Regions:
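Extracellular glycan-interacting surfaces
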Residues: 1-292
Length: 292
């Protein structure tokens, strides 16, 4: 198990019974996102079959991306990300820190990284190197070009059908690209941080929009690619006055949602009838499944 904290990363080899520091090489130590790719997903270029691609990734605040082939050997910073951060003036409205990387998604050797108040990054070599997608200029201001993504990117999903199908919730709405981030369409202009996309049907989505930061949050569903949205909170009081969905996780036949107040709710994907799970556990930030 690999976990990120406000002061580095920690690793457990006994499913959380004991923890050991695993942050060697981290300059920016506030970890906002952790991603681990299985060996089968770590494909190397055909002309370099002996070279290993990174298996673990960390996104930090201030915004930086770190990669590791073996966590025990330490982390390497992708300096091009920090250089973009400093040159373009990435920031967070609630913090003096220079933006943050708060989401990573992979499809084969293609990777995407969500930067809050910075835009969307792309890697074509398994996460070794990163650059802004063509449809994101990296400038933390609302774009005037409707084919550009809003820079306040909260998370990112790449669809199972294609590495070019990318969906990103932002402070300016939900965006989708069919060409790897070169051009974007805004599906809704509502503030959102989380979306789930059906791996078998890219037009089927569950969204957690809100009127603003943790204000009047709700859960909605679309089956037509975002043209229309219907309420998906049969067992909840909507909207929530002071909270919203931070993340969705598909686990088996269930969809789980982490809320901004740290509560964890779940629902069968077939009905989306939500209920609270683990009520005694507070301040949940993220969840992961373990292959036990």
């Amino acid at each position: 198990v690999l976990a990120g904290t406000r002061d580095g990363a920690y690793r457990s080899m006994d499913f959380g019974a004991s923890w050991w520091p695993a942050g060697e090489g981290l300059i920016e130590r506030h970890v906002r996102w952790v991603a681990v790719r299985a060996s089968a997903e770590r494909r190397t270029p055909a002309d370099a079959p002996s070279e290993a691609t990174p298996g673990a990734f960390i996104g930090t605040e201030p915004a930086a991306i770190y990669v590791a082939e073996d966590v025990q050997q330490g982390w390497r910073r992708c300096d091009e990300v920090a250089q973009l951060r400093d040159r373009l003036g990435w920031y967070l409205p609630y913090s003096p820190e220079a933006g943050c990387v708060r989401g990573l998604a992979f499809h084969g050797n293609r990777g995407y990284a969500a930067v809050e108040q910075g835009g969307l990054l792309r890697s074509d070599d398994g996460g070794e190197h990163w650059q802004l997608v063509a449809g994101s200029d990296g400038v933390p201001r609302t774009p005037t070009d409707p084919t550009m993504i809003h820079p306040d990117v909260h998370s990112v999903v790449v669809h199972a059908s294609s590495p070019d199908r990318v969906i990103a919730p932002t402070g300016g709405g939900l965006y989708v690209s069919d060409d790897g981030g070169a051009h974007w369409r805004r599906l809704t202009d509502r503030y959102c941080r989380a979306v789930w996309v059906d791996p078998d049907d890219a037009d089927h989505m569950v969204l957690g929009p809100a009127a603003g930061v943790a204000r009047d949050g709700r859960i909605e569903q679309s089956r037509d690619g975002g043209k229309t949205w219907q309420p998906a909170m049969d067992e909840c009081d909507a909207p929530w006055p002071h909270r919203m969905v931070e993340r969705f996780y598909e686990i088996g036949d269930e969809l789980m949602a982490v809320l901004s107040d740290g509560e964890l709710i779940t629902a069968p994907l077939s009905t989306l009838r939500w209920h609270v799970v683990l009520p005694a556990v507070q301040d949940v930030n993220a969840i992961a499944t373990l292959g036990i």
